Structure formats: structure tokens, C-alpha cells
From Swiss-Prot:
SMART domains: DEXDc. Residues 100-256 form the Helicase ATP-binding domain. Its EC number is 3.6.4.-. It comes from Variola virus. It is an enzyme of class 3 (hydrolase). This is Transcript termination protein OPG145.
Length: 493
């Protein structure tokens, strides 16, 4: 730990990383406060900040020679096989670490790698290469399985803990596995933080973008007060301000052979309303809709739009155009609606639900990986980040209010490299609720723009389903036809 006065140059360097956002750190009294220029307090400057050689410092940091926390179960023959681009990442990491050791800098590196790159297997290779006892920290238990699979493949002795940290600490008194896989809430326990700081050298923070380290979180406190000897941040969408805690970044562009297409399924809807919809419309401009909760609630009961989504999915799936489908909603009730309707059409052998409230969901996800055809309905919260079903070939985005980081993570679910190259995303920019029509159009356009400009998708027009349900979806041509019929009938009375 390094308590330093906030001199101008130090403040400017830290502030530059936050991209204009507020800068918050722990002060000498242990309070987590916003740092003001010219402050007289001393502040705890994160160890990882000095991992970048561009940051000037006279501080000297510990090296691996001061610890003896080495892996005992390592077997070089079990090292995972990597693709050439993954080997390039390993080479970059090793080269950077040699420079850091020479300059006596902290061994902290952010691996900024695209969704589908294979961050887990690449990091397991690095872990085996370092041969140091490791803690893998994930934001939620949904990500445990993919780490468990890769760690077992490398043949490392490991322990998984997702429930009580107190029981884990008791077990650690008699055994000290080479690899600990834990959920981040374990870091709220100071005794556990002290233990891993002493007995483990490498700390891997998976999905590091899910943590805002400008907030006083368990991860923030751990990195500030119990900084590990070595640290990797793993992310496809780095949060700029988090660089203060891990200031060296490796980003290798991924060249892909995938054919990625995004369709905007565009239809004209007659205005649709119910008592429930009218009630929710009144709340759109109030404080209760600050995070667009009611905007998404309106989409969940927008029957014409829901029917269009179902019709599109059913026809594409029946035709064999798509085979392994992920359907994403924002709200749980919206997820359940689609699940029940699809279940009636295709049955439980094809349709599955990714429900965060069901403890058996991780086992179900594991079982469907081997299926040739399935429809997996889930929420953005559960499946938007880290869902490990590499065979997914299509994505239906039923919600609209999604930030850029979530969009990139979500689209990454269908960008994993497999033998099959076609990937398709469907978005629905229209709504029958006229009060949110332009808002939804703008949000969906943001999804399209990011997918095309940043992720290599190609936008194509989609017109097959313009007349998918005459009772709920009205195209421009069918509407015009009805008007002409009315005129004709009135003239012939």
C-alpha cells in the first residue's frame, strides 16, 4: 500500500484515466471519498496503477522471489492447446512481464480480448505457465462451470466456493488447493482477503467490467488493502476508470471468418392499448421510469410486437435457417411469456429457460451444449454476460434499453468460433405503443450501429414477416388495402 499526497501531476494522471468522471479513492482515515484537486489528505494509490511504465514513480514493489506459493499439481503435458492468436497473447504477456520485472513494476495486466476469443482457456494456459497458486474471482456462480472445466482440463487441484466463506476458511486450515474459484462476495470477508493475500500469488478478476471500482465495493477494498502479487483483469469491454487498479493493457484484435448478420425486423403496427398499458404510460415521465423500467414493461405487454417476434422465430427455426437460438428479454415476466408460448409450439425437448431463480439452470445449460437444435429463453441479467454455450448461432433481442457495454457482451454470446460460420441477430425497432415508438427506434438503432461499426456485423433488410399476423400486425400495404376496401364499399351501398 502506498499513501501519497495528491500532488498535481499524480492527480492529473489519475483523472486522465477516468475520462472526466469523478475520481474516488480511500484516504488515510480509510474513508472512500471523491478526490478533489489540491486536497491535503493522503490517499491510498492502488498498486496496479503503477503497472504502466508511463507512470513515473520511485516506489519499489515486491517481486515473486519473496514468496513461495507455487502450484504443486502442475503437469506440463496437460497445458491446453491454443490457437495461434491465443499464443500471441501469451507471448505478449510474457514479454510485458519481463519488462515489468526489470523495471520493478507490479505484475498487473488487463487482457482486453473480444467476446469469443477464448479468454478462459488462454488465462488457464498463463496460470499453468506461471506455476503460482491462483484465486479466480467471478461476479456470479453462473461463470463457475466454464472455469471448472478448463482448470480440470489443465489438471490443477482446485476448490470451488460459491456459498459461505466462513466454511471455506475452516477447510483452508487443513488444505490449501492450488486454485480457488470463488464468487466476488467472498471478498467482503477480511480474514479471507488476508489469507489469499498471504497464500496465493495470482489473482484473476473475470468479467472485470462488471465492477465499478470508483465505488466502494468489496473488490475495490480488496485491491486497495490486500493487493495480490500478480493480477489479471479479463474483459471484452473494459471500464476506463478501472485502469487505475490495473494500468497495463494487452489488446490483440481478433480476425474472424464468421459471417455475422443483423436483421431489423421492421413492421407497421396499428396502435395497441389496454388498461394496463394506459396505466404504465402515465409513469413514463416520472422518477419511477428513471432507468426505463416502464419502457421495458410496456414492451413486455406489447402483444403485436411479441407476436411478430414469435412469428419470426418460429418461421426461421422451422425452416432450418437457425438452429441454436438465444432469446433475450429484460424482464423476467417477458421471458416467461416467450418461454410458455414456445414450449407449446416445440415442447420441452427443444425449448429451455435460463431462469436465475432456478438452481438447476447451470446443469441444464451444461446439458444443452451437445444438442443440435434448441431455443434458450433467458434474461439480459442471466445470460448477457458469460453465458457459455459456444454453439449458439442466433440471437433474438426482445428488449431495447441496453447500454453499449451490455450490447457488446450480449452480441458476443453468438460470436464464439466454431466450425459453423453463420451468426444471425434479430432486433425489432417498432412498437405498437405509440408513446414509446421513437424511443424504442433510437435504442434499437444503437444496437445496430454498434454491431456494424464495432463488431463486424452486416445489416440486411428483413421483409419475410411483414404480414405474419393479420390480427395484430398491420403492414403499410395491408392497411392501404383496407382503406381502399372501405371506400369501395361506401361507394357501392
Amino acid at each position: 500500500m502506498s499513501l501519497l499526497k495528491m500532488e498535481y501531476n499524480l492527480y492529473a494522471e489519475l483523472k486522465k484515466i477516468t475520462c472526466g468522471q469523478s475520481l474516488s479513492l480511500f484516504n488515510e482515515d480509510g474513508d472512500f471519498v471523491e478526490v478533489e484537486p489540491g486536497s491535503l489528505f493522503k490517499f491510498l494509490i492502488p498498486k496496479g496503477f503503477y503497472s504502466s511504465p508511463s507512470v513515473k514513480t520511485s516506489l519499489v514493489f515486491e517481486t515473486l522471489t519473496t514468496t513461495d506459493n507455487k502450484i504443486t499439481s502442475i503437469n506440463p503435458t496437460n497445458a491446453p492447446k491454443l490457437y495461434p492468436l491465443q499464443h500471441k497473447v501469451v507471448s505478449e504477456v510474457v514479454s510485458n512481464m519481463r519488462k515489468m520485472i526489470k523495471l520493478k513494476r507490479p505484475l498487473y495486466i488487463t487482457l482486453h480480448l473480444a467476446c469469443g476469443f477464448g479468454k478462459t482457456i488462454t488465462t488457464c494456459y498463463l496460470m499453468a505457465t506461471h506455476g503460482r497458486k491462483t484465486v479466480i474471482c467471478v461476479p456470479n456462480k453462473m461463470l463457475i462451470h466454464q472455469w471448472k472445466t478448463q482448470v480440470e482440463a489443465v489438471g490443477l487441484e482446485h476448490k470451488i466456493s460459491i456459498d459461505g466463506v466462513s466454511s471455506l476458511l475452516k477447510e483452508l486450515k487443513t488444505q490449501s488447493p492450488d486454485v480457488l474459484i470463488v464468487v466476488s462476495r467472498h471478498l467482503t470477508n477480511d480474514a479471507f482477503c488476508k489469507y489469499i493475500n498471504k497464500h496465493y500469488d495470482l489473482f484473476i478478476l473475470d468479467e472485470s467490467h462488471t465492477y465499478n471500482l470508483m465505488n466502494n465495493t468489496a473488490v475495490t477494498r480488496f485491491l486497495a488493502y490486500y493487493p495480490p502479487m500478480m493480477c489479471y483483469f479479463l474483459t471484452a469491454t473494459p471500464r476506463p476508470s478501472n485502469r487505475i487498479y490495473c494500468n497495463s493493457i494487452i489488446n490483440i484484435a481478433k480476425l474472424s471468418d464468421l459471417k455475422k448478420t443483423i436483421y431489423a425486423v421492421d413492421s407497421f403496427f396499428e396502435p395497441y392499448s389496454t388498461d394496463n398499458i394506459r396505466h404504465m404510460i402515465k409513469r413514463l415521465d416520472g422518477p419511477s421510469n428513471k432507468y426505463h423500467i416502464y419502457t421495458e414493461k410496456l414492451l413486455s405487454v406489447d402483444e403485436p410486437r411479441n407476436q411478430l417476434i414469435l412469428n419470426t422465430l418460429v418461421e426461421e427455426f422451422k425452416s432450418g435457417t437457425i438452429n441454436r437460438v438465444l432469446v433475450i428479454t429484460k424482464l423476467r415476466e417477458h421471458m416467461v411469456l416467450f418461454y410458455k408460448r414456445l414450449l407449446d409450439l416445440f415442447g420441452p425437448e427443444v425449448v429451455f429457460i435460463g431462469d436465475a431463480q432456478n438452481r438447476r439452470t447451470p446443469d441444464m445449460v451444461k446439458s444443452i451444449k451437445e444438442l443440435n437444435r434448441f431455443i434458450f429463453v433467458s434474461t439480459l441479467f442471466y445470460s448477457g454476460t458469460g453465458l457459455d454455450i459456444p454453439s449458439l448461432d442466433s440471437l433474438f433481442i426482445c428488449s431495447a434499453v441496453i447500454n453499449n457495454m451490455q450490447i457488446e457482451q450480449l452480441l458476443g454470446r453468438v460470436c464464439r468460433e466454431t466450425e459453423l460460420l453463420d451468426r444471425t441477430v434479430y432486433v425489432f425497432p417498432n412498437t405498437s405503443v405509440k408513446e414509446i415508438k421513437y424511443m424504442i427506434g433510437n435504442f434499437v438503432q444503437r444496437i445496430i450501429s454498434l454491431s456494424v461499426d464495432k463488431l463486424g456485423f452486416k445489416q440486411e433488410s428483413y421483409r419475410k414477416h411483414q404480414e405474419s399476423d393479420p390480427t395484430s400486425v398491420c403492414t403499410a400495404s395491408s392497411r392501404e388495402e383496407r382503406v381502399l376496401n372501405r371506400i369501395f364499399n361506401s361507394q357501392n351501398r
